[in-house]
A protein has these predicted regions:
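Short, acidic/polar linear motifs in exposed loop/turn regions
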Residues: 40-42, 97
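Short, basic and Ser/Thr-rich N-terminal targeting/leader segments
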Residues: 31, 43-45
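C-terminal interaction-tip segments
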Residues: 1-30, 34, 55, 94-110
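Intrinsically disordered, low-complexity Pro/Gly/Ser/Thr-rich segments with frequent PxxP/GP/PP motifs
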Residues: 53-90
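Short beta-strand elements bearing conserved aromatic residues within extracellular beta-rich modules
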Residues: 47-49
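Short linear sequence motifs
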Residues: 15, 40, 58-59
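Carbohydrate-binding surface patches
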Residues: 35-39
Length: 110
């Protein structure tokens, strides 16, 4: 079987509250391969990424990236191989400055 990659989710948080970027549907196994974070503001910003396999806890216990700086008007590409197969699970993101970052996840669903 050939995996067909696609955009799994895109989010531009309006505040500094963590929010779900992607959650697999029931019966779906997802592989998240790439996460792009784009800073479209003129200020340096930090971001966090969380992976809660079975819920919505977005803190130190589910963090996979924590307070990573991203320069103004720049892009960060994170390559990974994150598997998700629980429809209650979430890949979530957070920024310290609302309306500054756009997060886009690419991968495959099987």
């Amino acid at each position: 079987m050939t995996l067909q990659e696609k955009q799994l989710g895109q989010l531009r948080p309006i505040d500094s509250t963590a929010a779900s970027l992607y959650s697999p549907g029931a019966g779906v196994t997802a592989i998240i391969k790439t996460l792009f974070i784009v800073n479209t503001s003129t200020s340096d910003v930090t971001f966090r990424v969380f992976m809660d396999d079975d819920g919505t806890t977005y803190d130190e216990t589910t963090a996979i990236f924590w307070d990573v700086p991203i320069l103004a008007n720049s892009t960060v590409e994170l390559s990974s191989f994150l598997a998700m197969n629980n429809s209650s699970g979430n890949l979530a993101v957070r920024t310290n400055t609302g309306s500054s970052l756009t997060f886009t996840a690419f991968g495959a669903e099987v």
